[in-house]
């Protein structure tokens, strides 16, 4: 599966974790890619994950996305995001489509308010990334900045989004 490698950058975040950034270029549309994150000379490495690139827009091929909003933790129902991811999305794909998350979903769009307080490191880790890891390791995430993210460094560090939009609206 893994015949090529690339490298990127990494830095320590909040003293207790590392953020790794890699830009993948020249990917072929509608193709499954496998990846793992390797630190150093295989000092540590992740499980093997996969994702599928979207089809060419000119093909007009159908694809599925999930759109959700306001996924920040609610004290009256603190596990709702985890339930949506695991009991909703992942269980449904597993039952209906042989657990092929990458094959069934082209992307997940979260239209803001990923956490309650964007300046809180533990909320990003414990309330957003940890519950969603099983989904986002196979399906690309496209987050949209909400008022709860509060224009924080964490959002900017975690998400490197394309800036090639319509001129004047990048």
Which sequence ranges carry the predicted segments?
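Divalent metal-dependent phosphoesterase catalytic cores across multiple superfamilies
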Residues: 1-145, 149-169
């Amino acid at each position: 599966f893994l015949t090529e490698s690339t490298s990127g950058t990494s830095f320590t975040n909040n003293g207790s974790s590392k953020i790794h950034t890699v830009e993948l270029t020249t990917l072929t549309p509608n193709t499954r890619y496998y990846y793992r994150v390797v630190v150093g000379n295989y000092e540590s490495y992740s499980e093997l994950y996969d994702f599928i690139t979207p089809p060419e827009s000119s093909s007009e091929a159908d694809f599925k996305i999930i759109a959700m909003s306001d996924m920040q933790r609610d004290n009256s129902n603190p596990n709702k995001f985890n339930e949506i991811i695991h009991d909703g999305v992942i269980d449904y794909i597993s039952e209906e489509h042989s657990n092929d998350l990458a094959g069934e979903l082209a992307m997940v769009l979260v239209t803001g308010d990923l956490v309650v307080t964007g300046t809180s490191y533990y909320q990003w880790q414990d309330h957003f990334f940890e519950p969603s890891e099983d989904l986002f390791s196979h399906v690309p995430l496209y987050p949209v900045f909400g008022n709860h993210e509060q224009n924080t460094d964490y959002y900017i560090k975690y998400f490197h989004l394309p800036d090639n939009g319509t001129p004047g609206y990048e």
